[in-house]
Amino acid sequence: MKSTVETLSPTRVRLAIEVPFVELEPSLKKAYREIGQQVQVPGFRRGKVPAVVIDQRVGRGTVLNEAVQEAIPQNILAAVREHDLKTLGRPEVEITEFTDGDSLNFTAEVDVRPELTLPDLSTVEVTVDELKIDDSEIDEQVQSLRERFATLKTVDRAAGEGDFVQIDLNATVDGEEVPGGSASNLSHEVGSKQLLPGLDEAVVGLAAGASTTFTTQLVGGDHAGRDAEVSVTVRTVKEKELPELDDEFAELASEFDTMAELRDDVRERVTRGKRVEQIYAARDKALEQIVEAADVPAPEGVVREEVESRKTAMVDQLERIGASMEEYLAAEEKTEEQIDTELNEAAVQGVKIQLLLDTVADAEDVQVSDDEFGHEIVHRAQRAGVAPQQFYDQLVRSGAAGAVYGDVRRGKALASIMDRITIRDAAGEPVSLDALRAENEAEHAHAE
């Protein structure tokens, strides 16, 4: 096999590969063997059909085509190794010349990792918001906890904001019932805007047994975009009874004996959450700054594949919740072109960051231990709700284990970046990663 490489851009090359016919012999033998297992010829056992008979039955061209398709990836891989290329995505192959008995000539265009010049990471400095905790934020968290322990009490009055109502609904368009537009005994919190637009306004002021109608625009189904007349009947009205914020509540709702201890714990958790937000903000700003300084290009083919992957994931997620892309677009008040633009922008930045982290990992010779890889497998298996070994086996079968390994390696490269940059808040005070790590370790130790 002979090969040459032509640089088309900083992120794309064209390989020109010539494979002598004699080097195709192993692929030809394999093609004859596999085709021989599939055809039935009287007088011959399956798999024992002579090549000349196979040529007569299916044609020599069919065998050659199968051999070529099997040989091309192998020779691309050999050429990639010969020229020490770091390829990305799938190659685009074009056979330029091939006849029976002569050399196979083809080209393969493929995206490659660009050569990047990294800035001195120790000179990178980012600024994030100050860590400020207001008492109102603590009050909000405590109130949220209080709401979780509320009880519902039936009342003999009209429904108001924050009440829970049991309702019956029936929707019609032009006097005809909407398929799936009826429901009985639904529980709804007034003011939550969880169901139909206009429902909250309609039920305010209605007591048990009262009915009314309102108009709403349908976002899904055969009548999407049309106005529907909806009748609603209130069965019951219930109000929330909140527990008193005293030491008894602290014992009920937490591991603490007093409200003072509970509030202190809430403050610590809010503080930790804001520290995490600071670090995330610092991470995003640092990566954006370094990507710009390193002038990281985004290979078009890789970006295209990433956009397709993200859009497929979006559609799958919508299907899991029983929604369509059309319904999503209506709810977000966006066009498909706007969604595509957003996906493309996110994909471009994501690909640039991935290339940057790979370069940092190479420059610092980042390694992933078996324990680190295994921990990631366990973590992902838990999120997927399957056993770790089953999850790993699925990765191996799908050829995705290497991608997970790459993610772990990039994560370690990112951690290295974060350790070397300078982070300050808006007041000029340094923001330390060590404090957050110590808190997390202490929390994990306490949980164990």
Swiss-Prot record:
GO molecular function: peptidyl-prolyl cis-trans isomerase activity; protein folding chaperone; ribosome binding
Gene3D superfamilies assigned to the protein according to its UniProt record, in alphabetical order: 3.10.50.40, Trigger factor ribosome-binding domain, Trigger factor, C-terminal domain
Keywords noted in UniProt: Cell cycle, Cell division, Chaperone, Cytoplasm, Isomerase, Rotamase
GO cellular component term of the entry, any: cytoplasm
Compartments it resides in: Cytoplasm
One Pfam family of this chain: Trigger_C
Ranges where the PPIase FKBP-type domain occurs: 162-243
Listed EC numbers: 5.2.1.8
Catalytic activity: [protein]-peptidylproline (omega=180) = [protein]-peptidylproline (omega=0)
The keyword DNA repair appears for this protein: no
InterPro entries associated with the record: PPIase_dom_sf (IPR046357), PPIase_FKBP_dom (IPR001179), Trig_fac (IPR005215), Trigger_fac_C (IPR008880), Trigger_fac_C_sf (IPR037041), Trigger_fac_ribosome-bd_bac (IPR008881), Trigger_fac_ribosome-bd_sf (IPR036611), Trigger_fact/SurA_dom_sf (IPR027304)
Keyword Cytoplasm: yes
Notes concerning its domains: Consists of 3 domains; the N-terminus binds the ribosome, the middle domain has PPIase activity, while the C-terminus has intrinsic chaperone activity on its own.
Family statement: Belongs to the FKBP-type PPIase family. Tig subfamily.
Record HAMAP family: Trigger_factor_Tig
Protein name: Trigger factor
Lineage: Bacteria, Bacillati, Actinomycetota, Actinomycetes, Micromonosporales
Gene giving rise to this polypeptide: tig
